[in-house]
Amino acid sequence: MRSPQPHRSGGDTQQHFQSTVSVQKLKRFNSLILVFRFAAFCFSLASAVFMLTNSRGSDSLHWYNFDAFRYVFAANAIVAIYSLFEMAASVWEISRNATLFPEICQVWFDFGHDQVFAYLLLSANTAGTELARTLKDTCTDNKAFCVQSDIAIVLGFAGFLFLGISSLFSGFRVVCFIINGSRFYV
């Protein structure tokens, strides 16, 4: 699948023969990206839900009373929404053999946003980890609150891991596009 953009010399791109094996490799690669994006979505959504439901009693601790926990919730919710969009784009690409946006925009959009949101998750979950460590001394009274906060943070780190792997794959697509003029080397 070559880029519809002309070569640097000004000529049009040539239509190259593409074997069935190449098409299958491309679909397999895109399916693998979809699996990692789905995992990032699931873990980020679960982390956001765990943090959102982390309140104990009316006079007790609430997650929204702590800036770091609000950051963990917001970052994971944003990444869950982004991952949902990227899953839809991946399904579109697998089913139609074409990207949602023009190919050059799609590869840079995917790579850039994967990087930004992966670092957002890493930053938020690191801040949440530091607060959770600080709260360990007070966890004798509110053990359930602390455990649920820890679970939300661990789920967020798992979301970061899968988003980071997706970022590696989207980086591979950027490099292939730069070298070949196509998002996948076939």
Swiss-Prot record:
InterPro entries: CASP_dom
Membrane-spanning intervals of the chain: 32-52, 72-92, 104-124, 151-171
Residue intervals annotated with topology Extracellular: 53-71, 125-150
Keyword Cell cycle included in the entry's annotation: no
Principal location: membrane
Subunit structure: Homodimer and heterodimers.
Organism of origin: Populus trichocarpa (Western balsam poplar)
Keywords, comma-separated and alphabetical: Cell membrane, Membrane, Transmembrane, Transmembrane helix
Annotated family: Belongs to the Casparian strip membrane proteins (CASP) family.
Topology relative to the membrane: Multi-pass membrane protein
Annotated protein name in UniProt: CASP-like protein 4C2
Gene Ontology CC terms: plasma membrane
Cytoplasmic side stretches: 1-31, 93-103, 172-186
